[in-house]
Amino acid sequence: MNILFAVSECVPFVKSGGLADVAGALPKELKKLGVEVRIILPNYSLIPQKLRDGCTLHKVINVPLGWRNQYCGILKGEQDGITYYLIDNEYYFKRDSLYGHYDDGERFSYFSKAVLECIPHLDFEVDVLHSHDWHTAMVNFLLREKYQDNPLYEHIKTVYTIHNLQFQGVFPPEVMYDLLELGDEYFHSEQLEFYGNVNFMKGGIIASDQITAVSPTYKEEIQYEFFGEKLDGLLRKYNDKLSGIVNGIDTSVYNPETDSYITAQYDADSLYEKNENKRALQRYFGLPEKEDTPIISMVTRLTKQKGLDLVRTVFREIMEEDVQCIILGSGDSEYEQFFEWMAYEYPEKVKVYIGFNEELAHQVYAGSDLFLMPSLFEPCGLGQLIALAYGTIPIVRETGGLNDTVQSYDEETGEGNGFSFTNFNAHDMLHTVRRAIEFYHDKPVWEQLVKQAMTEDYSWEKSALAYKKLYKSLME
């Protein structure tokens, strides 16, 4: 079974969000199950030179884009036993950031066409083409509408994964007419038209044989108006080919037993070593070294989606508790400034690192006691899974993947791996934080809770089995 992942980013080459983690980890897990996965992505100038040096020029072709042919170099390389193809075109991919350019519609129209034009030249017979998010949604649409009549493509099945419905790739109609060479018959509400523009993600949903969302709860949520980003009606229409498969984490990267970034490695049976990480974290940030004061952390993009309005509303009330708080992340200036002000106001209790630091993030996961993630919506979420693996108990809102992966602690049965609240309400969150702090001070209960969190399986294995089953169903 041969699968081609068409993605706009992938670890270890280049990363702006969770899509890159999925594209980097899932193929390795599928390979263990006997599924051959290769990955095709743009050859961005941002890719580290040593990774590009590991690739060789496989072939040069031309890609028809509207009235002109564009150069396309196909580079080929291997990392961790996975074959990668990089689509080389400096005009489109020599930029200082992955996305957010005036010509993104043209850039990813080119990339979508390049993926399809490359397939006959890859020395790899593709059974299933698996596209991800808006950037490669049109690969599946163009395959169905423009390429499937060709014997080289007619057998290929398609899967499309929605990682975040909020970002849809909406562009002026000229992109469809001039670059993708699609006529008027595609510019109406049953096809690509979307409030007077063209919507790439809509194309992926319509044309793919199967659609997945990155958690079962998110799959349900996006069919309702509140979460549906104006595509809820379309998703209800195609509900029969929509499923939810929760993401995992790469346990070769996030594993407290082997993590070289943390001060002391540990497992569920050596939690005293976790306290060593806590002391190291307190020293790093200049916090008082108090072993019995819980550290609540957030490693997050500082955006509205992450529920930071709730945190802002009751932050001073949280500070009335005997806690320390560490925030690591960057994003909207209003949230950056708020947390910097809180660090100034509570110098003995609050520390903030604006930006991202991979090594420090690992130390925060290892050294904290509680991990706060009160998202407005969360397709899957990576932070809570990493926190659980490190025995740092998550406090989450019951939405998307948070609802699927965090089971609220039940003092009657002793079951659970975290704490959760239902409504997007600051005082519901505050109550849940206080409840978590209360149990933190009940050491036998807390130790049991941490062990339960750490001994669950957060790897990609279960997810990979679900994807393998999905691919297999398409080929029967």
Curated annotation (Swiss-Prot):
Synthesizes alpha-1,4-glucan chains using ADP-glucose. One of its GO terms (molecular function) is alpha-1,4-glucan glucosyltransferase (ADP-glucose donor) activity. This is Glycogen synthase. GO terms for biological process: glycogen biosynthetic process. ADP-alpha-D-glucose binds at residue 15. Transmembrane segments: none annotated. The gene is glgA. It comes from the Bacteria. InterPro entries: Glyco_trans_1, GS/SS, Starch_synth_cat_dom. It catalyses: [(1->4)-alpha-D-glucosyl](n) + ADP-alpha-D-glucose = [(1->4)-alpha-D-glucosyl](n+1) + ADP + H(+). The keyword Zinc does not apply.
